[in-house]
Amino acid sequence: GIFTFEDESTTTVAPAKLYK
C-alpha cells in the first residue's frame, strides 16, 4: 500500500517513500 514501511502488513504514519 501507499502507507507502508516494509510491506502491506506494516503500516506507518508516513508514506514508505520517505523511508526508502
Swiss-Prot record:
Induction of synthesis: By heavy metal ions.
Name of the protein in question: Protein PR-L3
Keywords, in A-Z order: Pathogenesis-related protein, Plant defense
Protein family: Belongs to the BetVI family.
GO process annotations (BP): defense response
